[in-house]
Structures are given as structure tokens and as C-alpha cells.
């Protein structure tokens, strides 16, 4: 038995554009149904199945609620499997990455919490733009190579956003 499509678990059609609030609501509903505690008095087999369903549901939810992970998953289920680590051949984006990293390093050295907040807003705007670009590209036939490039950019920005949140927490303490 294979793992069901993440979208099918939530009764959704594969799409990049999702209503994340509805996804979260549906996740909570389904999680209650398959929660292993509900099967505490069931047979060992039923408990194992409940645990597997719960794990699959959690994995599907984590994938679909994250834009970069959702983009990678869409590419994979469409037959465009993307290796995890690939050198990015995009000089403009590489330059932008270096500039963002230098700026973040300066903000850290200066312990500039307000500056980190401004940086975080700019990063969020860049993420929103990339998400829209990917969604438009995904909806256009024959754009899978561009979709892959955009997904890689999304992954980088997601990682950078995590680093920004960590810096913000350190500076806020």
C-alpha cells in the first residue's frame, strides 16, 4: 500500500494556491479522527494503523502548509523530481543571496532589533512575490523548469527567514 497523495488526504486538488486557514481546520478535524489515543483500547494492529495514519497526516500537513515544501511536492507528483542539493546557476540570485547574508550579518553585529524587523518585512515581501510567481508559473503549461528555479529560490528564502527569526529571538532576550 503506497502513501496517499497529500492533497487527497485533505480532499483537495493539487494546486499551489491553498487557503491555509481551511487547510489547518481540516487538519485538526482529521487529526482528531486518527489520533492514536482514540485507539488505546483497540488491537495492536489498529493502534499501529492509527499511528501510521496520524504520521502520514502530519507529514502531509507540514508539506502543504510550507510554500517551498508544497512547491517541491507538486513538482515531484507531476514527475519532475528535484534533487535536494543542486548548484544554483543563477548569478543574479546568487548576488542577491550574498547581499542579504551580509546585511543580516551586519544587523547581528550591531544587535539592531528594529533593523531585523525591517529586514524581515522585506524578506516576507520577497517570499510573497516568489510564491505568486511560482503559482502563476505552475498554472502555465510548459513552465516546469522555471517552476523548479523558483522553488529553489523559495527554499533559500525560507531558510533565511528561519535564520532571521532565530536572530530576532536572540536579540529580543
Curated annotation (Swiss-Prot):
Residue ranges of every copy of the J domain listed in the record: 5-77
Keywords linked to the UniProt accession: Chaperone
Xref: PROSITE patterns: DNAJ_2
Pfam families: DnaJ, HSCB_C
GO molecular function: ATPase activator activity; protein-folding chaperone binding
Protein origin, superkingdom: Bacteria
SUPFAM superfamilies: Chaperone J-domain, HSC20 (HSCB), C-terminal oligomerisation domain
GO CC, any one term: iron-sulfur cluster transfer complex
Entries under InterPro entries matching the protein: DnaJ_domain (IPR001623), HscB (IPR004640), HscB_C_sf (IPR036386), HscB_oligo_C (IPR009073), J_dom_sf (IPR036869)
GO term, biological process aspect, one: [2Fe-2S] cluster assembly
Functional note: Co-chaperone involved in the maturation of iron-sulfur cluster-containing proteins. Seems to help targeting proteins to be folded toward HscA.
Subunit structure: Interacts with HscA and stimulates its ATPase activity.
Annotated family: Belongs to the HscB family.
NCBIfam families in alphabetical order: hscB, PRK00294.1
Protein name stated in the entry: Co-chaperone protein HscB homolog
Organism: Pseudomonas putida (strain ATCC 700007 / DSM 6899 / JCM 31910 / BCRC 17059 / LMG 24140 / F1)
Amino acid at each position: 500500500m503506497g502513501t496517499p497523495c497529500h492533497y487527497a488526504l485533505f480532499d483537495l486538488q493539487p494546486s499551489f494556491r491553498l487557503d491555509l486557514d481551511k487547510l489547518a481546520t481540516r487538519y485538526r478535524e482529521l487529526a482528531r479522527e486518527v489520533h492514536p489515543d482514540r485507539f488505546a483500547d483497540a488491537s495492536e494492529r489498529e493502534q499501529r494503523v492509527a499511528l501510521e495514519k496520524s504520521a502520514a497526516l502530519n507529514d502531509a500537513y507540514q508539506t502543504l502548509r510550507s510554500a517551498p515544501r508544497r512547491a517541491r511536492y507538486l513538482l515531484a507528483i507531476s514527475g519532475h523530481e528535484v534533487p535536494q542539493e543542486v548548484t544554483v546557476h543563477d548569478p543574479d540570485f546568487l548576488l542577491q543571496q550574498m547581499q542579504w547574508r551580509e546585511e543580516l550579518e551586519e544587523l547581528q553585529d550591531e544587535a539592531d532589533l528594529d533593523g531585523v524587523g525591517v529586514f524581515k518585512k522585506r524578506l516576507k515581501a520577497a517570499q510573497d512575490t516568489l510564491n505568486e510567481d511560482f503559482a502563476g508559473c505552475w498554472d502555465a503549461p510548459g513552465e516546469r523548469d522555471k517552476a523548479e528555479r523558483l522553488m529553489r529560490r523559495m527554499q533559500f528564502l525560507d531558510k533565511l527567514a528561519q535564520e532571521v527569526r532565530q536572530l530576532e529571538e536572540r536579540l529580543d532576550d
